[in-house]
Regions:
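Hydrophobic alpha-helical hairpins/lids featuring a short glycine-rich hinge
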Residues: 175-235
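Short glycine/threonine-rich loop-to-helix capping motif typified by GTGT followed
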Residues: 381-393, 423-438
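Short acidic, glycine/serine/threonine-rich loops at helix termini
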Residues: 218-222, 275-277, 301-307, 366, ...
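Conserved small-residue
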Residues: 182, 207, 272, 279, ...
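Active-site-proximal alpha-helical scaffold in enzymes
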Residues: 177-191, 244, 248, 262-297, ...
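Conserved catalytic cysteine-centered active-site region
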Residues: 4, 129-176, 214-278, 311, ...
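Condensing-enzyme catalytic core mediating Claisen C-C bond formation in acyl metabolism
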Residues: 7-17, 21, 319-412, 417-418
Length: 438
């Protein structure tokens, strides 16, 4: 295994921030929401006050009713971004005349298709309407609504609207979260944007970010792919704003004003780590001295939820009811990483790090939060199912532990360290990750 040279720069984390279902990430606000019942009174008060501001609540954050509302409208819960009880759908149907004669109807002339079906006969009624006689059956799509079989997701706190915080101009939700998340991370360093940028030469700062899913809502790829099928036109923004590397482009253009290197590396749930690896490799080699790195995802849209559901990856409501032997789906407990579970839960978030080399961090007086000495990501080799677990997880953990032992010694590794579980909530992950962590 390659070891880290004692002469190479050490990547240090000098800022982090973003937004996720627990709230604002900087200064551990989101983490405190996760463990809020175990905090002392002062920290609880501060956490509730922060969330109340984020959620634009008018009530006093000290009030028990307001606090219960905050608890109920953060973390994993029933989907609020769209109505899971009325998901738009199209049902295909074949229309036939009841008396076996041709089908006759009229429509506005401007709504006629560009290619007239061969079995249609057209008669102009007036300047605005046309009568159509269809000699055979007519295939149509009927607007419909369905109840989603998955109604749980991790969503940013209710009331938080990233689009209201800047001139969003119909930006996809993932990019709206990017602007907030990256801004939060950069401001957490204590440096103004200009100060951070001026610490180094323009080619010594870079931004690495991506989105595994890309932007799939109606303001990006969702609109690009769906609009022609529902009688609308794609817009000039749909294609460009859907690109997976767009979060990094937004940071460069809207926040940092950087002309330095940029890249977007994509890798499913390891996308964030792929970009962190690129960042630390550049810092250790001396090519970069400041790197802003992050990931932004907004997959809580009906077609993405349905796509993961038909894979068998998500916890469906009926499966959760069966686990609890209940007639009611407990949306709050949809994700159960190391328990009896049925699948993972989609969530939206935008999380960012600001990394510096150790010399620059000391010279600039930056607040040092920790180091990121290495990142390991391994493929699984031959396997029958791409989504299934494989040997790569074992190699990744083994190399990470060897790196920690090399840096800190075996005693610290065994007695002074901890492992943060992946914990997706899928039955396969429950088995393989439990085996690795044992």
């Amino acid at each position: 295994m390659k070891t880290i040279s004692t002469n190479s720069p050490l990547p240090l984390m000098v800022g982090f921030g973003g937004i996720n279902p627990a709230g604002r990430a900087s200064f551990h606000h989101a983490y405190r929401r996760l463990v809020i019942d175990k905090l002392d009174q002062e920290k609880q008060d501060g956490t509730f006050a922060s969330l109340a501001k984020l959620m634009r609540l008018d009530g006093n954050s000290q009030d028990s009713t307001v606090r219960q509302y905050i608890k109920d409208h953060t973390l994993i819960r029933k989907i609020e971004i769209f109505d899971p009880d009325a998901v738009n759908w199209h049902s295909s149907a074949t229309l036939k005349n009841t008396d076996a004669k041709s089908i006759t109807f009229k429509i506005p002339t401007k709504q006629l298709p560009e290619t007239i079906p061969s079995n249609w006969s057209l008669t102009k009624i007036n300047d605005k309407e046309t009568q159509i006689i269809c000699e055979e059956s007519l295939s149509v799509l009927l607007p419909d609504e369905r109840v989603s079989k998955v109604t749980s997701a991790g969503q940013v706190p209710s009331g938080f609207d990233p689009a209201a915080l800047y001139a969003s101009r119909s930006h996809p939700r993932g990019l709206q979260l990017t602007v907030y998340g990256a801004s939060d991370a950069i401001q957490s360093t204590g440096f103004k944007v200009e100060e951070l940028r001026n610490l180094v030469r323009p080619d010594e700062i870079s931004v690495y970010s991506g989105s595994a899913m890309g932007q799939l809502d109606n303001d990006a790829y969702g609109g690009l792919l769906q609009n022609p099928l529902i009688g609308r036109r794609p817009t000039s923004k749909h294609c460009a704003l859907g690109l997976p590397e767009m979060p990094g482009d937004f940071v460069n253009a809207y926040i940092l004003g950087s002309v330095g290197e940029t890249a977007g590396i994509i890798g499913a749930c390891a996308t964030f780590l792929y970009n962190v690896k690129r960042a630390i490799d550049d810092i250790r080699s001396g090519n970069k001295r400041v790197v802003i790195v992050g990931n932004s995802e907004a997959p809580v849209v009906p077609h993405v939820i349905e796509g993961y559901r038909v894979m068998g990856a998500l916890a469906e409501d009926e499966e959760l009811k069966a686990l609890d032997d209940s007639d009611i789906c407990d949306n709050r407990r949809a994700c159960r990483p190391f328990s009896s579970n049925a699948g993972f839960t989609c969530a939206e978030a935008s999380i960012w790090l600001v990394l510096m080399d150790d010399q620059l961090a000391l010279e600039s007086g930056a607040r040092i939060l920790g180091s990121v000495p290495d990142v390991f990501v391994h493929a699984d080799g031959y396997k029958k199912s791409i989504p299934g677990p494989g040997i790569g997880n074992y190699l990744t953990v083994a190399k990470a532990m060897a790196s920690a032992k090399n840096l800190l010694g075996e005693q610290v590794l065994r007695q002074g360290s901890f492992m943060q579980a992946h914990g997706t909530g899928t039955p396969q992950n429950r088995v393989t990750e439990s085996h690795i962590l044992n």
